[in-house]
Amino acid sequence: MQEIQKNTKKEQYNLNKLQKRLRRNVGEAIADFNMIEEGDRIMVCLSGGKDSYTMLEILRNLQQSAPINFSLVAVNLDQKQPGFPEHILPAYLEQLGVEYKIVEENTYGIVKEKIPEGKTTCSLCSRLRRGILYRTATELGATKIALGHHRDDILQTLFLNMFYGGKMKGMPPKLMSDDGKHIVIRPLAYCREKDIVRFAEAKAFPIIPCNLCGSQPNLQRQVIADMLRDWDKRYPGRIETMFSAMQNVVPSHLCDTNLFDFKGITHGSEVVDGGDLAFDREEIPLQPAGWQPEEDDTALEALRLDVIEVK
């Protein structure tokens, strides 16, 4: 009995540490990008996956101690996919006492009609979903739309665009929506996916599978995700350094004439950002820039619990 109590206390201790880390990450992102302001009504897009559950939980937690007042309304889009457990989210949100709205739109039928069997449907589905969510935000009087993308999603998008699109373009933590009427925020921008996975398992969120539509996975994104995970295992701190690089861009040392006036450089121009280091021996730090070792990840393994299977 004492051993069971000891393990329970340890699990709770580790869960509290993990929640504090996620809360700190979200709080820093909100502050750095001014994501939430006094009186904001935040529409939290809830898919039923680990990321959106975690986002809602951390925002609710921050709401209790934030120096400003803001409200939350959770929104789920029921796209009429076969086997979608429509009872799960209402029951969960009512138990929490969170204001919510379930939007029912048969986008699944539209996608199946337009996209050949076996092909990836995510692109069309995403466009349809985006339009519906913008409309819903207007109807609810939401001032911000919160999406559950995390740090790993942002880095994956950067590499996808570099490898396949020829652009250095990631996923912004805050942006104006396509229709120019809404501000979209990503409060989990600084959060590691592996932390979110552990938190979701420990909290036993009622996860809804994301493959109910039967669409094939994005193989290009999967390749990038596997590459980043491999780097993270083999070279601890590399992911942190790459993300830090996205926050320390030096346009004068790239090749985009829209970002820096290369043509305007003449004799007598000032040295910019350290000048030319091409002939210098670069001093590479022993540890990646911006990286600090987290607490022993093995200690967090105690958080691993079974995720509720949705029948």
Curated annotation (Swiss-Prot):
Compartments it resides in: Cytoplasm
Keywords (alphabetical) are: 4Fe-4S, ATP-binding, Cytoplasm, Iron, Iron-sulfur, Magnesium, Metal-binding, Nucleotide-binding, RNA-binding, Transferase, tRNA processing, tRNA-binding
Q: Does the keyword Chaperone apply?
A: no
| Known cofactor(s) | Mg(2+); [4Fe-4S] cluster
Pathway connected to this protein: tRNA modification
Binding residues annotated for [4Fe-4S] cluster, in chain numbering: 122, 125, 213
Statement: the UniProt record of this protein carries the keyword Acyltransferase: no
Principal place where this protein is found?
cytoplasm
Q: Which domain of life is it from?
A: Bacteria
Free-text comment on the cofactor:
Binds 1 [4Fe-4S] cluster per subunit. The cluster is chelated by three Cys residues, the fourth Fe has a free coordination site that may bind a sulfur atom transferred from the persulfide of IscS.
Q: Where is the signal peptide?
A: none
Where the record places motif PP-loop motif is: 47-52
Record EC number: 2.8.1.-
| GO CC annotation | cytoplasm
UniProt catalytic activity: cytidine(32) in tRNA + S-sulfanyl-L-cysteinyl-[cysteine desulfurase] + AH2 + ATP = 2-thiocytidine(32) in tRNA + L-cysteinyl-[cysteine desulfurase] + A + AMP + diphosphate + H(+)
**What are the GO MF terms of this UniProt record?**
4 iron, 4 sulfur cluster binding; ATP binding; magnesium ion binding; sulfurtransferase activity; tRNA binding
Q: Which GO terms describe its biological process?
A: tRNA thio-modification
What function does the entry list? Catalyzes the ATP-dependent 2-thiolation of cytidine in position 32 of tRNA, to form 2-thiocytidine (s(2)C32). The sulfur atoms are provided by the cysteine/cysteine desulfurase (IscS) system.
**What miscellaneous comment appears in this entry?**
The thiolation reaction likely consists of two steps: a first activation step by ATP to form an adenylated intermediate of the target base of tRNA, and a second nucleophilic substitution step of the sulfur (S) atom supplied by the hydrosulfide attached to the Fe-S cluster.
Query: Could you describe the subunit structure of this protein?
Result: Homodimer.
Q: Into which family does the record put it?
A: Belongs to the TtcA family.
Q: By its UniProt entry, which NCBIfam families does this protein fall under?
A: PRK10696.1
Task: Spell out the protein name for this chain.
Answer: tRNA-cytidine(32) 2-sulfurtransferase
Instruction: State the species of origin.
Output: Salmonella newport (strain SL254)
What does UniProt list as this organism's lineage? Bacteria, Pseudomonadati, Pseudomonadota, Gammaproteobacteria, Enterobacterales
What is the primary gene name for this protein? ttcA
